[in-house]
């Protein structure tokens, strides 16, 4: 994937429009409760300021009604936090599409919630052209919305004088390309989660590429059903057994493997007080629920991870929120942390597991995109990246 990079451009004296992802959670009083996305946007903004650009930043926040900015929709709290992180005032500009505001080189303003503009979500061409007219350089630094074709992620990239990837977006593209397009072998993928149905496309796409496909959570239970194992009252999708079998067949035909659990942790309910039992996968009773990998399985999978060249991780392998069902995910996380392989991880639950087991510094790259990360794994073209690719030459 070839795109122009912000750091390759001379932005001195230029008006730069940055589409960031500042969609952060807030409490009922409007206080930001978690600011990772704002922090992740700082390098591109700082680069432009340090190099004498006049900087405009915008983002979506929540799911507002187009044409209105309600009290829950405003980026005002984000402007305050951005100012604190940049150590300079950040003015919030409302009704900005037609221009009429001034930004000097070395200054930064925040343009109010872009999803409040009529036509944003439908990638309206007239809106995109008006926004493109505000700038000399358009920067997309919002990988989390790269799978959506909207006016600030796609349309503007077509019409701005120059369109490029920001520092965060560039790092995402480089890391994902390294993991999936030129991986060091063996390539090991870990796909956890409740349902095969929601990740079927990913599983089939990866089955054509990876050397080992580790499945966890409810997905693993469906694969166990496909392998003829009894799973008691475990979460699974019996209607997806044929699809699970197809994934295993694709892997087998390539000489690759889906290593299924040999022992599991079971209980009769999912709760913090549930009594956990470690048993062989062949001993699962009619009322048992499989809630985690057992220690033998975890050790076997940790060995696979230890010998990997590249690791792609999406989804925990057990109900890791409860300590007695966290062993599999914890051992997996530890194996990834100690592996020499290049590792990339993404998806909300995966990030929660990384935080819980304190391995953020030991994962090669942590993707900021939930849906965008999944669609990339599915092999789909992401509209925002496709728009930047189309502008690579001009």
From Swiss-Prot:
GO cellular component, one term: cytosol
Compartments, as annotated in UniProt: Cytoplasm
Catalysed reaction equations from the record: (2R)-3-phosphoglycerate + ATP = (2R)-3-phospho-glyceroyl phosphate + ADP
Enzyme class: transferase
Gene Ontology terms describing biological process: gluconeogenesis; glycolytic process
Keyword Kinase: yes
Family matches, as InterPro entries: Phosphoglycerate_kinase (IPR001576), Phosphoglycerate_kinase_CS (IPR015911), Phosphoglycerate_kinase_N (IPR015824), Phosphoglycerate_kinase_sf (IPR036043)
Transmembrane feature ranges: none
Superkingdom, taxonomy of origin: Bacteria
E.C. no: 2.7.2.3
Keyword Repeat: no
The entry's keywords: ATP-binding, Cytoplasm, Glycolysis, Kinase, Nucleotide-binding, Transferase
Molecular function terms, GO-annotated: ADP binding; ATP binding; phosphoglycerate kinase activity
Main location per the UniProt record: cytoplasm
Binding of ATP, residues: 199, 321, 347-350
Family: Belongs to the phosphoglycerate kinase family.
PANTHER family tied to this protein: PHOSPHOGLYCERATE KINASE, PHOSPHOGLYCERATE KINASE 1, CHLOROPLASTIC-RELATED
Self-association and partners: Monomer.
Protein name per Swiss-Prot or TrEMBL: Phosphoglycerate kinase
Species annotation: Azoarcus sp. (strain BH72)
Lineage summary: Bacteria, Pseudomonadati, Pseudomonadota, Betaproteobacteria, Rhodocyclales
Underlying gene: pgk
